[in-house]
Structure formats: C-alpha cells, structure tokens
Amino acid sequence: MKYASKEYVYMPPTCSCATTAAPAAAAGVAFLHGLTPQQINDMLCTAQVQMAGVVCDGAKPSCATRMYVALFGSLQAMMMAKEGIRATNVEGFVHNDLKVTLENLYRLQHDVLHNKVDAILWDIVKEQKVIH
C-alpha cells in the first residue's frame, strides 16, 4: 500500500480510516505473521472491497467505530488470504492486482463520489439544523 495515498483523491469522499489506515495496519500484522507478498496483495484487495462504500462525513467520535470495523474486516481478510480465499475480479471494482484495484477505487472516488458526497452531506446537516 506504499502508493495508496498518492492514488486517492485529495481529501477523498470515502473514509480514510476504513480504506487506508486499517488495511495498512493489517498488512503489517500479515507481514509479521509471515504471509507472502501475494497473500498480502490478496488481503488488501479483499479489504478494499469490504469498505469501499464508507463515506467520510467529517471527523467525530464514531470514526473510532469505523476504524474498528475496518480493522476487524481487514484482519478477517488476512485470515482468508492465508487460506487462499480472496475477493476476485468478478466482484465489482476489485482486480487481482492491488495497484489496479486502487486505481479503480480512485476512479470511483474521483468520477462518481467527488464533490457529490460533500454536497449531499451539507444538505443533510442543514436539514438537521446543526448549522445555520
């Protein structure tokens, strides 16, 4: 994942805790457990599929819950990869190669979600009268 952060949209509409931090932490655990580079690739691809739709709606205490869910999912993906199980290229935007999976996620963020998520969240916050 050394190239993941430069591939994402600047200030991505998806939760960075869920799509970057947790999978990266789990990759470190996987490395320490002796998983091969291919198994770590498989684990990270599966982890990206699990959390790709989680949007960022601002930093707040509930982000810790998102981080926990993402880390648990990433560690589950590690256990799956250890057994040769992974998300495959017939399951949405995931590809067999992590770099291509991240490029696909970038396209999803940039072409579909970028700016739209902020506008929708702004409307929701105004409707809830949290801001004036």
Task: Describe these PLM feature segments.
Residues 22, 29-132:
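Functionally critical mobile loop/hinge segments
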